[in-house]
C-alpha cells in the first residue's frame, strides 16, 4: 500500500499541475493590455478560454481574461506599471 501512495505522489510531481486563473493580462512590466486589439483573441492566443474589455482604475479599459495558464502574467496590484 505504501508503494502505491509513493508511486502516485511521484507521478503527480512529474506530471505537474497546471492551474487556470482569471485576471487582467499584462506585459512583463506589469502594464495592462488595452482593449485594442480585441481582448477575446488576445486571451485565446495566450491560452485563455475567453476575454472581454473591462474598466480597471487607474489604467482605464483593459483586457480581462478567463482561464489563463500560470505562465501568462496577470496584473499584480502590489506592483506598479513601469514603462
Curated annotation (Swiss-Prot):
TM region(s), chain numbering: none
Propeptide: 83
GO biological process, one term: defense response
Cysteine pairings via disulfide bonds: 31-81, 35-53, 39-63, 43-65
One term under GO cellular component: extracellular region
Domain LCN-type CS-alpha/beta: 21-82
Leader sequence residues: 1-19
Compartments in which it is found: Secreted
Tissue-level expression: Expressed by the venom gland.
UniProt keyword annotations, A-Z: Disulfide bond, Ion channel impairing toxin, Neurotoxin, Secreted, Signal, Toxin, Voltage-gated sodium channel impairing toxin
Pfam families xref list: Toxin_3 (PF00537)
Record-level Gene Ontology MF annotations: sodium channel inhibitor activity; toxin activity
Matching SMART domains: Knot1
Matches recorded under InterPro entries: LCN-type_CS_alpha_beta_dom, Scorpion_toxin-like, Scorpion_toxin-like_sf, Scorpion_toxinL, Scorpion_toxinL/defensin
Main subcellular location of this protein, as a coarse class: secreted
Comment, domains: Has the structural arrangement of an alpha-helix connected to antiparallel beta-sheets by disulfide bonds (CS-alpha/beta).
Family in the record: Belongs to the long (4 C-C) scorpion toxin superfamily. Sodium channel inhibitor family. Alpha subfamily.
Function: Alpha toxins bind voltage-independently at site-3 of sodium channels (Nav) and inhibit the inactivation of the activated channels, thereby blocking neuronal transmission. Is active against mammals and binds with high affinity rat brain synaptosomes.
Protein name: Neurotoxin-1''
Source organism of this protein record: Androctonus australis
